[in-house]
Amino acid sequence: MSDTAYPSVNDLTLEEKASLTSGGDAWHLQGVETKGIPGYMITDGPHGLRKSLASSTGETDLNDSVPATCFPPAAGLSSSWNPELIHKVGEAMAEECIQEKVAVILGPGVNIKRNPLGGRCFEYWSEDPYLAGHEAVGIVAGVQSKGVGTSLKHFAANNQETDRLRVSANISQRALREIYFPAFEHIVKTAQPWTIMCSYNRINGVHSAQNRWLLTDVLRDEWGYEGIVMSDWGADHDRVASLNAGLNLEMPPSYTDDQIVYAARDGRIQPEQLDRMAQGMIDLVNKTRAAMSVDDYRFDVDAHDEVAHQAAIESMVLLKNDDDILPVAANAKIAVIGEFARTPRYQGGGSSHITPTKMTSFLDTLAARGVDAAFAPGFTLDLEPADAKLEAEAVETAKNADVVLMFLGLPEAAESEGFDRETLDIPAKQVELLKAVAAENKNIVVVLSNGSVVSVAPWAGNAKGILESWLLGQAGGPALADVIFGKVSPSGKLAQTIPMDINDDPSMINWPGEEGHVDYGEGVFVGYRYYDTYDKAVDYPFGFGLSYATFAIDGVNVAKTGANTAHVTATVTNTSDVDAAETVQVYVAPGKAAVARPKHELKGFRKVFLKVGESAEISFDLDERAFAYWSEKFDDWHVEAGEYTVEVGTSSRDIAAVAVVTLDGDGKALPLDEWSTFGEWADDPVGSKIVASVYAEGEAGNLPQLPDNDMMRMFLKSMPINSMPMLMSDGGKAITAFMLDEYAKIAETAE
């Protein structure tokens, strides 16, 4: 044993090292107890602890777990735009892990919502990588601040459930770097998650678990990741290849440790690589020892329920509020229609399914608060046809009410881990019920329960108010009552565009793929990056959300702070008679670019609570990355010189003010050669001078003159200069030779 407090890889035999790279059972590390390395528990939990009651036996049961606080899934939390609140959720989750002796909680999942039909959208954050990364980092930092580990997942490009165990996500390098990697990258660089879970799918033909470029070259060497990488459950198909790629831990165990031993002995695994992977597992255990050594700890159930309550309040997005139908007056005659009001859908299905410590429905909350309301279920929470008797009862109940609160949405069978949705619509029987009620009473507020966006446009005309409540966790009932009756103002903002029609989504042409692959043909134009760039009509834009208050944004100023950095300031004022919160959003719009870029991209946001008449100055620092795109030519981030517009507003389509900043650019340039086009020479700082010389020498009669008309200039622009002889015969050869010779002289002088 070494002199350190805990064993290191140098204290282990080859067999013991190999054993650390596989689990002990479905929910435990293997450990080496004889060397003082315990086999701690790891378990599910993107939005709360799901410790299966069968965990002690190593079995899996998705619906039978110890009671834990069920916080709103990421579909709701993401709409809070409140990283500080999300950090508190993370802290609470960690405390519950400490009580249950869970060393690592498996989450958060930060895969991009490429398509709203994705079956797991309820536990992912956004269509925007900046928002996803800057929110989900709160879970990671909050959990790990208490000495419990997280598992950032699913790395990478796990954006659908259809064929997820084997599908190849075929994605350009630029789209990976700009859309599918940044949330992971930001969290790695700012919070260092103790574990990362690789995805099931292949990326450009290579399984994530066996992808050394992904797990080592990018994750560790480029981003500086210090933790371990584990497989998703059953995603490791070749232990030797995966370990060599940078996978520390296979889960669950395949009981093939001998494969690692044999490979280490015959040279297929280098000793240093096995040592690195095993030492990573020891380091993980050591990080969690203190928290796992706390005995008789009990978390505060009520305090955690209050965190869930606040999270649920801030998760709701008010989409429509005609005639100020919300908030509802305390003395109003209220009808509540919809089974969701009595039997709430508070979480998604699959591995994140939690047994809550408490559960209070909206109807229970009304009763507890002494609010009188008539109720009719209206429909059943299944995919069966409409029940005429339930419909008739609901219409009669709603007929004479001052306000009808209709709870509509997706039943659990409609969205879950394991399959993708087939439609954006809510069940037809619910829409027909809404229309029937609206025929008798126009004062309707629809309260939606769903894990991903649903079509609103087909039925929105039948309601004066629409409150998107997502899946609110265990405290959704009280939170809904607080918002609906005006105790608090809604403050949520959409983290995902609501399209007019699912076929408007740019990914639909390649969704969900075919014959084992899906081509991400939309490239970087995901979500609002597509809709806003191509001016497509949407139902509700990214970042949108109404309030009971009104706000004004002014005093926007952008100051250049470096060659390619800027500082943004703005003042936001509550101009209403309601205390409320507003989220100010900053977008960066490029000017002229060498590649196709989105119209604008989110690069900053700040949620601020303001009392009536109160103002606050807020500021944002935009680093070089905020202005950059991934250049496949340079294989690196690239900032072009020129003007950029900084937009400040409250959604991607509600911009209050803009300011322009001129950047120097990063000066990147590839050496020019005979295969560089005439246009590339003309755009290059050095090449442009040589192009000018070509025209000047032609005027002087020292070189053949280039054709000088609009058509030929366009023709030349995309022509490599070694093709000019095809256009001008010997004259083209002379021009090409002159350009290359002049370039060589300049390069020689620079050296």
Task: State where each predicted segment sits.
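Glycoside hydrolase catalytic-domain context in secreted enzymes
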Residues: 1-629, 643-648, 652, 751
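In a subset of proteins, long, contiguous C-terminal domains/tails are tracked
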Residues: 527, 543, 547, 577-579, ...
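Terminal connector regions
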Residues: 624-668
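Low-complexity, Pro/Ser/Thr- and charge-rich linker/hinge segments at domain boundaries
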Residues: 664-683
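Conserved, compact domain cores that house catalytic/ligand-binding motifs in diverse enzymes
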Residues: 678-746
